[in-house]
A protein has these predicted regions:
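Eukaryotic small-GTPase/lipid signaling interfaces
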Residues: 1-392
Length: 392
């Protein structure tokens, strides 16, 4: 902010002829000052946080003391209104959201006192998961996404919103894995797997790509993927749905199918945040902060690339979902989100449920290769980047 204020106070060149002062004033200083004030306005509208007290003080002092020029004097009142609104906690306009009018009625089981996973509608589970994901995603402030703040040693303080999104994603993935592995009966395991596929499919339909991705990642993990006897009892219809979901998140051509889908989607939407951390990490690590020819020159191309990613994040923070929050289902999910097994323990549990064998004993109309031909192509580089950014 200090540099922006310094830019506003553009000094008159020492060698400027008096006869050319008016021209310099109109063509140089006035446009520079208007742009500087406009950047302050944009920051107050979209990026300021109530914690940015020092920066707010600077802008307030600037507005009271510097905006005396006739061509920007009208902006003083506007800046002061935005400062007051930001300090009241409503200055960030991307938090002022449109609210759909109609709320769909929750699809609840007969009894909420003793909830069982398979007795809860996959549609309603998808809605409640979407509310969880959306509320967490909407709490992310853009500054948290700059300079890989989420991967810093003080990430919990600098990027709490991003950290919470990553944590929720990991909890959902672990919940899916352990819910399947905790079932001894193979028929019930297959039913649970189909239930999760139905949840992922409805999440896809309502643009909750974050939960969809988390469920797909869980079902594709080694502990679940190898359960041939379980997959043999999953219907062909459900397998086709799961295959289509996997096609959407394939890494081919830098996840082009998912990115194309995201470009066309209308909010509300919960995007998969892991792809944003991948893109921002690539931009941060692959581009210098300044131009190689002069370290004093800022590399604006790098900032422009990052701004494109940040703009897309903000685009999905305008419109929230309008589902009815069901407290008992939130409590059910919170209770089961607590992981109880390590990755090694999960794999050992998987081997205990279905020991290694050359082929599925269920055979019949199902062959594992029928499914894997559609399955997601592994992207080791992407998975490594996700793990570095906290995703499991």
């Amino acid at each position: 902010m200090e540099l922006l204020i310094d830019r506003f106070h553009l000094e008159i060149p020492s060698d400027l002829e008096e006869s050319k002062f008016q021209q310099w004033e109109e063509l140089k200083r006035t446009p520079v000052q208007l742009r500087a004030v406009n950047v302050m306005r944009l920051w107050l509208e979209y990026f300021c946080d109530t914690d940015d007290e020092k920066a707010l003080d600077l802008v307030e002092a600037f507005a009271n003391n510097a905006l005396i020029y006739r061509h920007v004097n009208g902006m003083r009142g506007m800046l002061m209104r935005l400062i007051r609104r930001c300090r009241q906690g409503s200055g960030n306009l991307n938090r002022k959201m449109m609210q759909p009018k109609m709320q769909p009625k929750p699809l609840l089981p007969p009894s909420l006192s003793q909830l069982c996973f398979l007795n809860i509608s996959p549609i309603e589970l998808a809605r409640q998961l979407t509310l969880m994901e959306s509320e967490t995603f909407l709490r992310i402030y853009v500054p948290e996404c700059v300079n890989k703040a989420w991967a810093s040693s003080d990430a919990r303080h600098r990027a709490s919103g991003v950290v919470n999104v990553i944590s929720l994603h990991n909890h959902i993935t672990g919940w899916v894995i352990e819910t399947i592995l905790n079932e001894e009966n193979v028929t019930q395991r297959a039913a649970i797997t189909s239930h999760f596929i139905a949840i992922a499919n409805y999440c896809y339909q309502i643009n909750n790509f974050s939960t969809m991705w988390a469920i797909s990642s869980a079902l594709n993990c080694a502990s679940i993927y190898r359960l041939n006897a379980t997959w043999a009892l999953v219907s062909r219809k459900d397998l086709d749905i799961f295959s289509e979901i996997n096609q959407i998140i394939q890494p081919t051509r830098n996840y082009s199918r998912y990115r194309d889908l995201l470009d066309r989607v209308n909010p509300p939407c919960v995007p998969f945040f892991g792809l944003y951390t991948k893109d921002l990490t690539f931009i941060e690590d692959g581009n210098s902060d300044s131009l190689w020819s002069d370290s004093r020159l800022i590399n604006f191309a790098k900032r422009s690339l990052a701004a494109d990613v940040l703009y897309e994040i903000r685009r999905f923070q305008f419109v929230p979902y309008n589902f009815v929050r069901v407290p008992s289902l939130f409590e059910f999910l919170d209770l089961h989100f607590k992981p109880r097994m390590s990755d090694e323990e999960r794999y050992e549990r998987s081997l205990k449920l279905e020991p290694r064998q050359s082929s599925s004993p269920y055979g019949g109309n199902y062959h594992r290769h029928d499914f894997t031909s559609y399955d997601m192509i592994p992207d080791e580089y992407f998975m490594k980047r996700l793990q570095e950014n906290g995703f499991t």
